[in-house]
Amino acid sequence: YNTGVILTGDTKGVTVNEFNGDGIPDLSFTVNNGSVSTFLNTSRKKFVGVRIKGKEGNLRAVGATLTFSTKNGTTQTIEVTGGGSYLSQSGNTKFFGLGDDVSGQLSVVWPDGKKFVLNNVKQGLVDLMWN
């Protein structure tokens, strides 16, 4: 897959996050002995960004499972983890592609087993807090 991003130098860290409030995932990179570079996604693809917040003792809601289903039958699942990869860390915003759909259903199973369902979720950002 060609991202269209070209970096020079010894690039070690990357994060996918939502930096400008449009609900589309953006990229940020670090280069050894260099500055941070951020690339805002200018594609016309449709995404739902879910910002998830935990509670005391598990502020990142590690162990939560998010499932997004569209009307055309596409299902995507993401588990919230506590790590990333070498010199990287996963952000608290999780992204789901809408494809040709305009909305879908978001289901969350929190680390304590409680379930929450949100219907008719459209492109953009959704904030969820574990209660």
Regions found by a protein language model. Give the residues of each.
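Gly/Ser/Thr/Pro-enriched helix-cap/hinge segments flanking short amphipathic alpha-helices
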Residues: Y1-N131
